[in-house]
Amino acid sequence: MVWSTNIKHEGLKSWIDEVAKLTTPKDIRLCDGSDTEYDELCTLMESTGTMIRLNPEFHPNCFLVRSSADDVARVEQFTFICTSTEAEAGPTNNWRDPQEMRRELHQLFRGCMQGRTLYIVPFCMGPLDSPFSIVGVELTDSPYVVCSMKIMTRMGDDVLRSLGTSGKFLKCLHSVGKPLSPGEADVSWPCNPKSMRIVHFQDDSSVMSFGSGYGGNALLGKKCVALRLASYMAKSQGWLAEHMLIIGITNPEGKKKYFSASFPSACGKTNLAMLMPKLPGWKIECIGDDIAWIRPGRDGRLYAVNPEYGFFGVAPGTSERTNPNALATCRSNSIFTNVALTADGDVWWEGLTEQPPEPLTDWLGKPWKPGGSPAAHPNSRFTAPLRQCPSLDPEWNSPQGVPLDAIIFGGRRSETIPLVYEALSWEHGVTIGAGMSSTTTAAIVGQLGKLRHDPFAMLPFCGYNMAYYFQHWLSFAENRSLKLPKIFGVNWFRKNNQGEFLWPGFSENLRVLEWIFQRTDGLEDIAERTPIGYLPNIQKFNLNGLNLDLQTVQELFSVDAEGWLAEVENIGEYLKIFGSDCPQQITDELLRIKSELKEK
């Protein structure tokens, strides 16, 4: 076979042979990552009805893809962590015995690529020449995955060359799980919802994914490698793999700092990563909007890289008002999945414009009528190259990463949590991360206003016992040679009694970043100590031009003692799921906050 002559790595070659014997594809193709290959595969998908080319006047070299209605999101119930013991996976993960799961998957994968091409996709998470980076090889029968991996990762010949004859790589096997009999016509989005499995084996750092063609389940470099496998590796190797954005922020005097920030989904991570400042002289630049790998540098500071090469952004709600940089980023060379299509070949989703254009074809390919179900799926996406972001930071591809001055944790909370507060210590900061939660919306979970705990925004992505993960974070404070960043909590989503947001949000969030910037510079008089952390001194916080009334300001920046006592109680109750594995330092911090609040 031609593919094998181009692979010098015997271990890789024998694995591909083994997979081919199991899955029985009709062809095998080694992907080189070239633009020519990308164009060829897009043309192939146009011919099968998988892709629709958009009007090049609006979106040059862009495509719309419609998935099956039952393959539209990550599937937590079919996502498994396989470790030698169940305790190692912890109470927040679905655990399966590795040997049992391998036998089960072996049966599922047997003959699953019949009638399809097996694509060999060498990819690198992180800059190729970086000590941070991890190389993987994904074997997949989905051309959609190949094209998406070209956008989302460094992929192709350069990665294969870097492996040489014996370099380490992670084995990532994926199939849509729909073999084709001779003469059987394919469907535009093959998948196998009844047999979906997204499985992570921590004993050999491998992933096997079956039955889904959707993003996080099928682009195995993203959540599977960059978070679930990487977080497990990071624990033993002394670093962190986090669900975080990374931004550079420059003040009017030209001083620059880097922040990372962790938010659960639907809390504005991409909007903050691409924020366009309204305050004169300030600049925000984006390194990444979703994943950060963080390692101690030689100088003792923590350095972060974005292991990804593209954005996989949620489309609904993205507009010229909320995120003009995101719209500019996905204007060309992008793939849109499950958005609506206009009559003149453009894309549309809820929130893009105030009024929907008519006529519209919805994400299922049917004529759309106003007042019915959404035209674009709520989890519809754009996949766009990182380098197209207008506010891309010059250090976006730095092999060493960028030094962090602040780590920010946030959630969607309508009450109690102030606009911004600073942890009193690293241990307190870890407690803020462990206690993160968001108020769900009816669209997400049926019950409006229910609190959903999501520690460090890593609940779906931590590849091992979360209590051990908390302990790993705490261990950084034990290393006296480290110069750790300050930790902050933020909440853009406080509401008044009428249910209206107290804070304007979006570009005005720069005012919060300005205060954080000043605190990392050591300005003491702009903050006041409280039981829950350092809160802004209202007189020293930049509210100029916002026209907020005094009551609103007080609600945004005050400590609601009663609310916080309930909050501490709620966090403590949640952490009971970890039993005696929950670190004592976190319990001690919660007790400290409780006793100080009662003394007030």
Curated annotation (Swiss-Prot):
Residues noted as binding substrate in the record, renumbered to the chain: R74, Y214, G215, G216, S265, N379, S380, R381
Keyword Transport among UniProt keywords: no
Entry EC no(s): 4.1.1.32
Swiss-Prot/TrEMBL cofactor(s): Mn(2+)
InterPro entries: PEP_carboxykin_GTP_CS, PEP_carboxykinase_C, PEP_carboxykinase_GTP, PEP_carboxykinase_GTP_C, PEP_carboxykinase_GTP_N, PEP_carboxykinase_N
GO molecular function (one): manganese ion binding
Domain of life: Bacteria
Ligand binding (GTP): A266, C267, G268, K269, T270, N271, R381, R412, F506, S507, E508, N509
Family membership: Belongs to the phosphoenolpyruvate carboxykinase [GTP] family.
NCBIfam families per record: PRK04210.1
Name of the protein this chain belongs to: Phosphoenolpyruvate carboxykinase [GTP]
Gene from which this protein is expressed: pckG
